[in-house]
Structure formats: structure tokens, C-alpha cells
Design a protein with these regions (language model features):
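Long, helix-rich interaction regions
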Residues: 1-201
């Protein structure tokens, strides 16, 4: 399937939710089919992180060597393992031109926003060594979310301490775990979110 055939602006949101709702077997099959189209590489990387199977981790490290996919692959790796690339000193300096994006120059033809803006540049060598030491903690065929299972407790922790895209996934997981749950409003003012989180215990 070519994801470009799905109309924007809901394409990426629909894809993420699809990956969250699919079981492991169906998700692997879907991603394998997705991999047949080179233009789907970014979807494939993000999907691997959401599916959460640690069998994807070595492949994600390979994607970190490509400047075009490095940061997204790092985010996907963190999504599975829970490894904070910044606090664990697993990031590197951006390559020359790696942070290229829109400028203030009216003559600059590059007007597209960098979809990975704000994500750290992962160091594949350090991360590979980390995986050699810690890989035995993860069981292939199991869905992981930030280093643990997809549980209510883990999702609440992600809502409290996670990055924004992790928090969005956690909010959706809570609804999937407990059908009928009102979707946590991650866009609400901070004080309101804190009040909602306090009521979830």
C-alpha cells in the first residue's frame, strides 16, 4: 500500500491509530507490505516504534545512519525501549546541513517545515552498544511502550513525564485499554491536564 494515496491531513493520525489497534501478527504483515514501496520508509519507521516489537530495534539503529531518517528512527527506538536519548547521552551533533529547514530568506525555495524538528540526533554506535547490554530485557513478539507493557499505569506515567507524541499515544492507549474512557485532552492548559491526571489515580 502506498500511504500517499490516503488523503491528508488525517493520513498520519490514522496510520498511528491503526498501528496501535492492530495485533502483532497483522501489524507485521501490514508493515511488510508497506516496505515494498520506498516512499513509505518514514511510515515504516514510525510504525515499527508504535508496534513496539523489539525485533525491529537493530533495523532502527541502521536507519539512524541515514540523516533523512535518523531522528525519526531514534524516536521509534525510544518508543519501544523507553531510552531517553538526551538524558542518557545517546545523541550526537547534527551532520552538516542536517538541521536545514525554512529560513528567513524570501529567495529560499525550501519552505517545508522539518517534521523531525526538535528530535535529538541519535548516536547509532552508542545505541548499538546499549542494545548489546540491555537487549535481553526485551522479548521479541511482545508489544512494548516506553520500555514496559501497554498498561494503564504505564500510560499514566507517560502522560505525566513523556514527550508530546508519546503522550498522545498514551492517551489513545488508555481508550483502547478501557473502552468508553474519555480521551485525555493533551492540548488542554497545563493546570487542567494536571487536574485530570490527579483524578486518574
Amino acid at each position: 500500500m502506498d500511504m500517499s494515496e490516503i488523503p491528508e491531513p488525517l493520513r498520519l493520525r490514522a496510520f498511528r491509530l491503526l498501528m496501535q489497534t492492530m495485533d502483532q501478527h497483522d501489524a507485521h504483515a501490514w508493515l511488510s507490505n508497506c516496505a515494498k514501496t520506498p516512499e513509505n520508509l518514514r511510515f515504516l519507521i514510525e510504525g515499527a516504534g508504535i508496534v513496539g516489537d523489539p525485533s525491529y530495534l537493530p533495523w532502527l539503529i541502521q536507519q539512524m545512519t541515514n540523516p533523512k531518517t535518523a531522528r525519526l528512527a531514534g524516536e521509534a527506538f525510544s518508543l519501544i525501549t523507553g531510552l531517553d536519548l538526551v538524558n542518557s547521552d545517546m545523541e550526537r551533533k547534527p551532520p552538516d546541513g542536517g538541521d536545514a529547514g525554512p529560513t528567513d530568506d524570501p529567495e529560499d525555495p525550501n519552505v517545508e517545515t522539518d517534521p523531525d524538528d526538535g528530535l535529538p540526533w541519535p548516536d547509532p554506535n552508542r545505541i548499538s552498544r546499549w542494545l548489546e547490554v540491555n537487549g535481553s530485557r526485551f522479548e521479541s513478539g511482545t508489544r512494548y511502550f516506553l520500555g514496559a507493557g501497554v498498561t494503564r499505569e504505564n500510560c499514566i506515567m507517560a502522560l505525566k513525564d513523556g514527550y508530546q507524541r508519546q503522550r498522545i499515544l498514551a492517551a489513545h492507549y488508555l481508550c483502547l485499554l478501557e473502552p468508553g474512557t474519555v480521551l485525555f485532552e493533551w492540548r488542554a492548559p497545563a493546570y487542567r491536564q494536571q487536574r485530570l491526571l490527579a483524578a486518574m489515580h
